[in-house]
Amino acid sequence: MLNIGPFSFHSRLLLGTGKFPDFDVQQKAIDVSEAEVLTFAVRRMDIFDAKQPNLLEKLDVKKYTLLPNTAGAKNAEEAVRIAKLAKASGLCDMIKVEVIGDDRTLLPDPVETLKASEMLLEEGFIVLPYTSDDVVLARKLQELGVHAIMPGASPIGSGLGIVNPLNLSFIIEQATVPVIVDAGVGSPADAAFAMELGADGVLLNTAVSGAKDPIKMAQAMKLSIEAGRLGFEAGRIARKRCATASSPLEGMSVVE
């Protein structure tokens, strides 16, 4: 089970809802992924305008936990305002904090992310900050009391996969809250690798919505995350410089 604050989920795949070709493909991809948590940008959806078609009216909201994010925020104050807007619309208190500090790389602003997380915790939100693979920043966020850490594998939408597995493994090793790898995942192999490192979950969007067949890719991501988790729990063999025979030598007949 993936436990985040008071919530428990069977699926370790969290799925973003942007950039799908249409609502039908989006819904089918969500269905086959078996994701229970769906994230969306509050700023890109007019949740108060009933005339505008949006994700909330297309989905069975009782079946999913909707995770609004603060994408578009440039500072802590903007992030807090967006979070409060989501809460006022009737969504749950869980929020993904996203404060971008660089328009080219879309990397998060560490100072504003810390500040926003602290402010939202004081407001009683369940806080999941998107951060870089900075080990020290992850620890400081954890010390604030956030409910999960969401380090990026690589820049948002890049599909580069896990570019710094060493830092990611350090974050996972020191974590006392769930670590959900977020951003940059491009393939099922990337998702499986994140889980093999010990991540508690993976959040992805473009890897599915931008695939040639988003529905098949959603299923592939589901299976790879399950396989990666099983592999982590099973424990891989140690890496060695020299070969070790896979067949036992004891009891073998000697042919002369």
Curated annotation (Swiss-Prot):
Any GO BP: thiamine diphosphate biosynthetic process
Keywords in alphabetical order: Cytoplasm, Schiff base, Thiamine biosynthesis, Transferase
GO molecular function per UniProt: thiazole synthase activity
Main location: cytoplasm
Catalysed reactions, as listed in the record: [ThiS sulfur-carrier protein]-C-terminal-Gly-aminoethanethioate + 2-iminoacetate + 1-deoxy-D-xylulose 5-phosphate = [ThiS sulfur-carrier protein]-C-terminal Gly-Gly + 2-[(2R,5Z)-2-carboxy-4-methylthiazol-5(2H)-ylidene]ethyl phosphate + 2 H2O + H(+)
The keyword Manganese belongs to this UniProt entry's keyword annotation: no
EC number(s) from the headed UniProt entry: 2.8.1.10
Protein name, entry field: Thiazole synthase
Gene name of the record: thiG
